[in-house]
Amino acid sequence: MMKSKMKLMPLLVSVTLISGCTVLPGSNMSTMGKDVIKQQDADFDLDKMVNVYPLTPRLIDQLRPRPNVARPNMTLESEIANYQYRVGPGDVLNVTVWDHPELTTPAGQYRSSSDTGNWVQPDGTMFYPYIGKVHVVGKTLAEIRSDITGRLATYIADPQVDVNIAAFRSQKAYISGQVNKSGQQAITNVPLTILDAINAAGGLTDTADWRNVVLTHNGREERISLQALMQNGDLNQNRLLYPGDILYVPRNDDLKVFVMGEVKKQSTLKMDFSGMTLTEALGNAEGIDMTTSNASGIFVIRPLKGEGGRNGKIANIYQLDMSDATSLVMATEFRLQPYDVVYVTTAPVSRWNRLINQLLPTISGVRYMTDTASDIHNW
């Protein structure tokens, strides 16, 4: 009888140990015996590295971004007023000498003017009867007309010359990224601006980051806000495009916020063209969990960059107390920024319930061991 009882004891111990392991949820990893690299700031005080601001109507008003207003762009207006197209290699010119059809290339019934015009050669010249090669690259139409007129005067009395461009093929700007029709756009005798180029490309896609468009001109990058330009009429964001310019519209992958904690659906949310408010973020996460959340502990954690980070602070934390439902008005006015973390804390009673749930397997295991031991004793 005693031997049978002893044989059952290892089984009871195993049941107890397995049940006890469930007290600590999730996985854990010990650093003992591992090569831990010491850090100079290992003893940092996290409380001193953040700023905590209770959300108030006044604070929200201070944080509210000031709207861009419609402003003229005098520099752009001057550039457009003085704009002149200069011919480049590959362009096709049409030269007309009035009352001299033998010098005027006829387009013909089935041929376009670009097919029958005068091609500008790679060496920058084009050929014209009587006067031979004419250097045209880098010149305006008025300069080319004057040159041809002067040289034809040797052969024709008082020549009446007209020059126009049949095909613009030498100079291009490039539109890429999140537009509906990316590709190259010809620089013509009509000035091409950023707004013109975006419209010609079919507009922006739903995944475009219109706040951080990149214009590369002469090897230098400049950030352009199409939001300010297209939504608020800030013409200072518009630019004249020149040959070789690249306009890149990035994806909005970086325009996201994170909703964590006691919400019904923890999520990573993408911001759309109009941005996102705290209320929208909580709504997209299907709201806070009313059974486990602490309505007074809704936090927005905003990482600090630049000057804030250099002052030893790593984040600003904004706290919203939603125990009074009227505070949703403030949440609606509080605009989130990319990489904000919205965190909803746990209510104290919920933490107690979770502790009980974690202890139940152990309690059950101990009870099972006790009952089994009693059965063995009475066996």
Curated annotation (Swiss-Prot):
Principal cellular location given in the protein's record: membrane
Pathway the protein takes part in: Glycan metabolism; exopolysaccharide biosynthesis
Protein name as annotated: Putative polysaccharide export protein Wza
GO MF, one example: porin activity
Classification via Pfam families: Poly_export (PF02563), SLBB_2 (PF22461), Wza_C (PF18412)
InterPro entries named in the record: Poly_export (IPR049712), Poly_export_N (IPR003715), SLBB_dom (IPR054765), Wza_C (IPR040716)
A Gene Ontology biological process term: polysaccharide transport
This protein's GO CC annotations: cell outer membrane; pore complex
Membrane topology, from the record: Multi-pass membrane protein
Signal peptide, first to last residue: 1-20
Protein source organism: Escherichia coli (strain K12)
Lipid-modified residues, S-diacylglycerol cysteine kind: C21
Compartments, record wording: Cell outer membrane
Gene symbol of the encoding locus: wza
Keywords: Cell outer membrane, Exopolysaccharide synthesis, Ion transport, Lipoprotein, Membrane, Palmitate, Polysaccharide transport, Porin, Signal, Sugar transport, Transmembrane, Transmembrane beta strand, Transport
General function of this protein: Probably involved in the export of the extracellular polysaccharide colanic acid from the cell to medium.
Lipidated residue numbers (N-palmitoyl cysteine): C21
PROSITE patterns assigned: PROKAR_LIPOPROTEIN
